[in-house]
């Protein structure tokens, strides 16, 4: 897929954060030397080509009272896709991948309560033939910020605003109070926002309020960690990032905090967590690593383990995207 230098710069800028202003495309255009209309036309073209999955709000479910967890299980090939269809049918499941490992199905599930969670997991277990289902809740979040560097600058990492991870962690502990108008605005932005010259005015019309109400409430939701950002979300493979590796490692408890922060600093890492371990699955440090080739993922892992007291480790490459969508109410 042919992208010029301005396309790539625009994709990087729009992944970072779309300004919460009446004229967001003008603000972006001034930074890149483009007219607002050209920003919008290029954005529409990149979405039509499939490089951009969607443009809208990236929300933190925990800030609205949902608990997200990672799950893995070994599913026999004869029932793999039947089980995947059941998993994917639940709204609370946003990601589901086949990975190159004995545990070949990995999915995420957000639910408001343990009762709701079990009502979903029961049918999933049954469809998969009742294998052991590993549950990996996060115990510490070091990074949660997908940024695919489209400009090929090795020094350019994810432009995460200062304090943003702290706000997300706070929202995990103290869910934000929201009213019905907040929820209407969230619903309008959890899919695709309107690609218009004044997009937030259209969001306001649909939500039944004024544009300034929308912008003010989005700023508040962002400051409390419920809204991570309004941004463009890319399709990894179409953007050239075909290698997607889940790195898991065994780290001493007294070292995992510092090691996790150092691992999170790699620009290729989008997610980095401390997660629950088990006697037969001792890994407690997890990171998602994205790159154009598996060799680069392996290079990042080598660089990390040469500097850290890592015990056992593994890299589970994804071989098939079974479901990938944004969380929604």
Task: Kindly label every feature range from the protein language model.
Residues 1-329:
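A compositional/biophysical signature of low hydrophobicity enriched in polar/charged and small residues
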